[in-house]
Amino acid sequence: MAKEVAGLIKLQIKGGAANPSPPVGPALGSKGINIMEFCKQFNARTQDKAGKILPVIITYYADKSFDFVIKTPPVAIQLLEVAKVKSGSAEPNRKKVAEITWEQVRTIAQDKMVDLNCFTVEAAMRMVAGTARSMGIAVKGEFPVNN
């Protein structure tokens, strides 16, 4: 028989750096989940992605056990890494902070495809380009139609 799901918790934690301090401790502790056990499992599974911010969805059950799924880093974080800037523009429509190519957009879109709600790489590229635009990061050139 399947376990009874008590709820979901969504967090963004740096890979290999989960610890019982906020935001992890209070979020899990209030639900009765073993914080140290989660931290050990998360850190073990994310050692290869150390330092990158990773979204994690924790499913906890009525018997206080849990499972979790680690997603790919957010598009905004990947865009900042590719553009080599620390933050987006305060005025994205007026002031651009960086410029990236469509090839870089394609790479991010292919990496993020599993988490996005789209069926084609082109649709994912448009989503990534929209995020870049809202952050003040310009995309060089025209959208590649036949690629």
Swiss-Prot record:
One GO cellular component this record assigns the protein to is: cytosolic large ribosomal subunit
Supply one GO molecular-function term. Answer: structural constituent of ribosome
Q: Self-association or partners: how does it assemble? A: Part of the ribosomal stalk of the 50S ribosomal subunit. Interacts with L10 and the large rRNA to form the base of the stalk. L10 forms an elongated spine to which L12 dimers bind in a sequential fashion forming a multimeric L10(L12)X complex.
What role is this protein assigned? Forms part of the ribosomal stalk which helps the ribosome interact with GTP-bound translation factors.
Instruction: Give the NCBIfam families listed for this entry.
Output: L11_bact
Tell me which family the UniProt entry assigns to this protein: Belongs to the universal ribosomal protein uL11 family.
**Would you tell me the protein name for this molecule?**
Large ribosomal subunit protein uL11
- Which species is the source of this protein? Bacteroides fragilis (strain ATCC 25285 / DSM 2151 / CCUG 4856 / JCM 11019 / LMG 10263 / NCTC 9343 / Onslow / VPI 2553 / EN-2)
